[in-house]
A protein has these predicted regions:
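Proline/serine/threonine-rich low-complexity linkers at boundaries of modular beta-sandwich domains
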Residues: 66-85
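Short amphipathic alpha-helical molecular recognition features
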Residues: 27-31, 37, 92, 110
């Protein structure tokens, strides 16, 4: 009789331990994700909009986006703050200053009252510059695009950051190319 009780206690303890392990593993799967859309592909995860992070149902009083499988007001990646896809690729002439406009969607009201920045990645370097939000467009301040390679063009991306710490990013980015006209005078940016 005591052996049956002991056996059941061991089984219950083991099950409770394993359940906690499964929950901890699921939590770790969420916390390592930095994209809203990717977060919502994991059934145990939710996206905290204000905190701009993926968690396992730990958003508190934050706006929460749930996976599409959950019946909720904000459910699925269509509610993720993101750069609008399908914008035409930008092409810049190396050495020229240009302003960039990025169309975004799913802007939550409180976001509009925070500072905005654009993060430009080109030539293996990251540059963060001031930006302004007007309606659903982010206007990045003028930036001198340079192709520092020996290639006719280099590619880069620009993404959108918001909040006072500038660590909260919209999903997605806008691609661009920077042409060296001395190596490729047929580049669209060189014929302007």
């Amino acid at each position: 009789m005591y052996s049956n009780i002991l056996h059941n206690v061991v089984l219950i303890t083991l099950c409770a331990f394993l359940f906690e392990c499964v929950l901890a593993t699921e939590k770790d799967k969420c916390s390592g994700v930095s994209s809203c859309a990717t977060c919502l592909t994991k059934t145990m995860c939710t996206w905290c909009v204000t905190k701009s992070r993926c968690t396992k149902q730990e958003c508190g009083n934050d706006n929460v986006i749930y996976p599409k499988s959950v019946v909720a007001l904000l459910s699925g990646p269509d509610f993720c703050p993101r750069v609008v896809e399908g914008q035409k690729e930008l092409v810049f002439k190396s050495g020229q200053r240009q302003k960039i406009t990025i169309k975004i969607t799913q802007i939550y009201l409180y976001m509009a009252f925070t500072p905005w920045k654009c993060k430009i990645n080109v030539n293996g370097k990251e540059h963060v510059i001031i930006a302004t939000l007007i309606v659903d467009n982010v206007y990045c301040e003028s930036f001198e695009f340079k192709n520092e390679s020996d290639e006719p063009y280099v590619t880069g991306t620009v993404s959108v950051l918001w909040d006072y710490e500038y660590n909260k990013a919209f999903d997605g980015s806008l691609p661009f190319r920077v042409c060296r006209c001395d190596l490729d005078d047929s580049c669209v940016a060189c014929t302007k």
